[in-house]
Amino acid sequence: MRLLVGSVSGKRAVFAVDGDKAVNLTEAVTGIGDDQAALIADPSLLEQAQEKARELARGAKGVAVSDITPALPVSAPPTIICLGLNYTDHIKEGGYEIPDYPALFMRGQQSIM
């Protein structure tokens, strides 16, 4: 299941994407909320969402993915762990040496743009 958090007509929701169509899981499954935080925290909720997405995908209901304005998957993450120099072309472009270990660094909520 591919998930997309975004807004349609100004209303933010979690959508399950299938091809060029998406179904609104926020409306279909109680407790999901308008980002992926609840799905990450509760595996049983994710299972419910997968089941509901399959059910809704069989029906004609849905919205075009092109009509969804993407948003952050988690609207207020406490900390973001980033991976720097994570692909060879990036390393070469920057003139860096390939590291023995990945470069990890953290960002706080305030650094999200």
Identify the function of each model-found stretch.
Residues 1-102:
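N-terminal non-catalytic cap/leader segment that marks the start of a structured domain
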Residues 97-113:
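Structural signature of FAD isoalloxazine-binding scaffolds in flavoprotein oxidoreductases
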